[in-house]
């Protein structure tokens, strides 16, 4: 299907708005005040010494801006930014090709760095420490080792699973930064900025309700804003108010606590199938038909933060808050 000029213009406008949502400098990056101050010092020091920034590991829950922050670092350093992921690195040749293409001072960003295969991870060690690649060529009987010099570069790794990063890899990062959940005040500023980008008004009461449902996460806040905006455009002449937001959030099955259907399925399973626990994560995953990694990375961080569950050596346990949520007085 061919797009006419009007359609192409609309798509271009949408892309531009999406781009404008993403901050491009540390000054524009909202929240994470202490982290920004520290990172700013590191960047200024590296530029003053005309050196590459030390390798940086960023960790924290999904949706807090790890990729955006990595892009900002490259922009602040005025260097090229290259991106890949741990899952995409299936063979040693993939990493060798990527590293060999780097220029002086480049930032190489590896998302989900905890998913790097061990054999590929080990190639990074000499690259990070000495800016060299040691490669073994040939067959089992006739092996030949060659060394390739690399220009100084900065590796930025991002992970939602800090504990899964091996000690040898973790120790090679000179800088390690943690992204924390955003405060309600910070999320208000982010949503207000988003409303300006989209030229869509939002009243104060609706703003606060949206913040409550954003789970301390900018990505969720912006996604909810866009979905409510869809309803406002169709049913309310583009105005986001309490009435239209309630309709949208009800359709999206997101309650006042920020819990959605997936959260309720998890918590209901924990209470009804396993009597509140303790129960192993694999049993919960099998019961609700979900991957263990998805539960650990997507569901549980917020449920733990808000006090709906606890992790113990014996397994997951539902808290009194969860039983109250389901109006069950039989608290184990």
From Swiss-Prot:
S-S bonds: none
Assigned keywords, A-Z: ATP-binding, Cytoplasm, DNA damage, DNA recombination, DNA repair, DNA-binding, Hydrolase, Nucleotide-binding
Cell compartment(s), UniProt: Cytoplasm
Binding site for ATP: 21-22, 63, 66-68, 129-131, 172, 182, 219
First-tier enzyme category under EC: hydrolase
Residues binding DNA: 311, 316
EC number(s) per entry: 3.6.4.-
Region (Small ATPAse domain (RuvB-S)): 183-253
Cited InterPro entries: AAA+_ATPase, AAA_lid_4, DNA_helicase_Holl-junc_RuvB, P-loop_NTPase, RuvB-like_N, RuvB_C, WH-like_DNA-bd_sf, WH_DNA-bd_sf
Annotated region (Head domain (RuvB-H)), positions in chain: 256-332
Similarity remark: Belongs to the RuvB family.
Protein name (database record): Holliday junction branch migration complex subunit RuvB
